[in-house]
Amino acid sequence: MQTKLLAIMLAAPVVFSSQEASASDFFGPEKISTEINLGTLSGKTKERVYEPEEGGRKVSQLDWKYSNAAILKGAVNWELNPWLSVGAAGWTTLNSRGGNMVDQDWMDSGTPGTWTDESRHPDTRLNYANEFDLNVKGWFLKESDYRLAIMAGYQESRYSFNATGGTYIYSENGGFRNETGALPDKIKVIGYKQHFKIPYVGLTGNYRYDNFEFGGAFKYSGWVRGSDNDEHYVRQTTFRSKVINQNYYSVAVNAGYYITPEAKVYIEGVWSRLTNKKGDTSLYDRSDNTSEHNNNGAGIENYNFITTAGLKYTF
């Protein structure tokens, strides 16, 4: 789905360029630009469980880590006039990528800082990740060699993981870390998904010197709606959580060189973070068909870093 979206965005300028001459001023030179990039995605996703009846202390945390997943990224920007532009962008992983997951529990309220149970799952995969972004920019400062804009937009991002096999250390029958073992290699243990809906505001700008151009962007949101789905296959249990008004921060920097007046090659780095916040969670136990709901019983966090190299072409 996301790959198709990128293809549509990148093909749009070709369609526009074939319109009648009467619209040539509106779609003329320096009015539409497209970008296509290849790169990698690395990051970590965290899910937490809290116990409201024990003062909201943390009783469980799962850390999902991945590195260098191949991604395809694209964008199209349309300058409606010299001071206003709209854009669409997105990226998607090209295939799954190996990772690692660590699951820790703190079940003894008398020693809340010491974990009692831990499992490690080196056979973990990032199944997919993707994002789309729609935005509008107002260029309040625009000179021949630099410009600056405020922007507002909406983006959504999704992540999916599976953990298979692994080893464990449990505290059983009143003992402390007294039971160890390994799960069969082919047993799917946990599946996890995150979904974020992010309205944001920010700043963006660039500076050009001869054929070199440098740019950056900053995004902020305090209105993120996050949700996740945690499937414990062995226990036949599903956890679903929702968090509202999370904080989101993103910083992007890029540097490029114009090989022709219309074409620029460039590299870019983007760091993004969704900070942890408590939300409501629901548990569904399929072994006995029971369920329960807890307010402020879950926490969701995500951060990642994207590096890409690509081409920008202006029509």
UniProtKB/Swiss-Prot annotation:
Protein name: Outer membrane protease OmpP
Active site per UniProt: D103, D105, D230, H232
Cleaved signal peptide residues: 1-23
The keyword Protease is annotated on this UniProt entry: yes
Gene Ontology CC entries for this record: cell outer membrane
GO biological process: proteolysis
EC number in record: 3.4.23.-
GO molecular function, one term: aspartic-type endopeptidase activity
Membrane topology field: Multi-pass membrane protein
Function comment: Protease; also acts as a receptor for bacteriophage Ox2.
